[in-house]
Amino acid sequence: MRLDRRALYALVLLLACASLGLLYASTRDAPGLPNPLALWSPPQGPPRLDLLDLATEPRYAHIPVRIKEQVVGLLAQNNCSCESSGGRFALPFLRQVRAIDFTKAFDAEELRAVSISREQEYQAFLARSRSLADQLLIAPANSPLQYPLQGVEVQPLRSILVPGLSLQEASVQEIYQVNLIASLGTWDVAGEVTGVTLTGEGQSDLTLASPILDKLNRQLQLVTYSSRSYQANTADTVRFSTKGHEVAFTILIRHPPNPRLYPPSSLPQGAQYNISALVTVATKTFLRYDRLRALIASIRRFYPTVTIVIADDSDKPERISDPHVEHYFMPFGKGWFAGRNLAVSQVTTKYVLWVDDDFVFTARTRLEKLVDVLERTPLDLVGGAVREISGYATTYRQLLSVEPGAPGFGNCLRQKQGFHHELAGFPNCVVTDGVVNFFLARTDKVRQVGFDPRLNRVAHLEFFLDGLGSLRVGSCSDVVVDHASKVKLPWTSKDPGAELYARYRYPGSLDQSQVAKHRLLFFKHRLQCMTAE
């Protein structure tokens, strides 16, 4: 019997698929082959949550528990790894996962060293980003319900064990019963205790009951909460009740803060900090190339290899030639804050030092002191002092506050000179809200606050107003930079460039840039007015 052409093609295709399937199975399951999925060995730890991890109070540890594997599997194991899916051969139409092992970018000795330094940076990041409001607090059973006051967090669409739940009933009862109600998630248990009745597993309303109080409390240690609604930053206020008593507590639903870490630099011999590896100097220039070159020359006297980033919106730009200068050009008159954004966007170091283009470094411009402050405190930004030719030095320490106004009128901004308190461990340094235009800051925090490019002519304190409440600011009066003299002797020739600069830099009270700034503050920050001392 002869096969027609279609049947023959189908038979050939079937045999080819079968051969590929057998080849795939044999290579995947062949004994003695190295496992292609294992990229690296993660830090040794328990491969999964075991019974000891679920027994938080020793007094209930003797009560047996039947673990619910499907629920325990939803909990964070704190032992992640990255594995590819599939075998050696990439088969068509099959979705596969590709894993990348970042540790392969280092040799063994370098990996050990960089892992230690990364952990040190991470712990410093946690110390800066966490507060007392994040700590877990358990309310004692005064009601007689014990429950967490704060500090319970779950990632969106993830599950956690809920800590601290307990019933401390003084009177003997036939049945001890508690109830949990959520609105944005569901309840379950990671294990079942014999003698405890559960109603509502996998639902938003869970009831637990038992004639034996210890067994009920052992079961409460195994209660899990699962986020069921994707909201990146919210909270579920849940209710926990027993007969005659009800309490409420909050479960935060959010992603943990994602660190932005910078590798620590090696220290040159005899130096406290490698400034060139830690700091980039950033400035915005407009027309004043003589002042800019003087600034660069003064920096090179003390920091020969530090990178300098320049944002330039001059009409006829002049290129600055220096092996460690990055010069970026902008449209003419683009603006003061737009230039700041451009300069900061190109910084790759942990810290950025902001300076005006007419500053001059001296022996008192000790960047090491400012770096030391940021390395050893949770501050995000620390300013220095600017010394005028008269010898007077200013730190421009400013306190900012916003007072609520009447409905519909907007709030009132209060600005006054001063500081909140001294910075412990650093003489001549204080904590404040705003500082002079000479400061060292964490690069990621400056980018987070940003400079509003709508402020294009005159602006400074507006940056600190944008950062009020999120930017931790300090000031040290003993780190000083000089300000080039603005005094013009009458017998010297006029500088057309300086006159043009002055027209842009010092607009009158009725200039449209000032009006635009006031309109912006009115709407953006919902302000009706401000006072300044």
From Swiss-Prot:
What Pfam families does the record point to? Glycos_transf_2 (PF00535)
| Molecular function GO labels | (N-acetylneuraminyl)-galactosylglucosylceramide N-acetylgalactosaminyltransferase activity; acetylgalactosaminyltransferase activity
Membrane-side (Lumenal) residue stretches? 26-533
Look up keyword Ligase and say if it applies. no
Annotated pathway? Sphingolipid metabolism
Gene3D superfamilies cross-referenced by the UniProt entry = Spore Coat Polysaccharide Biosynthesis Protein SpsA, Chain A (3.90.550.10)
Reactions accelerated catalytically: a ganglioside GM3 (d18:1(4E)) + UDP-N-acetyl-alpha-D-galactosamine = a ganglioside GM2 (d18:1(4E)) + UDP + H(+); a ganglioside GD3 (d18:1(4E)) + UDP-N-acetyl-alpha-D-galactosamine = a ganglioside GD2 (d18:1(4E)) + UDP + H(+); a ganglioside GM3 + UDP-N-acetyl-alpha-D-galactosamine = a ganglioside GM2 + UDP + H(+); a ganglioside GD3 + UDP-N-acetyl-alpha-D-galactosamine = a ganglioside GD2 + UDP + H(+)
What is the disulfide pattern of this chain?
Answer: C429-C476
Regarding protein family, the annotation reads: Belongs to the glycosyltransferase 2 family.
The protein's name is: Beta-1,4 N-acetylgalactosaminyltransferase 1
Source organism: Rattus norvegicus (Rat)
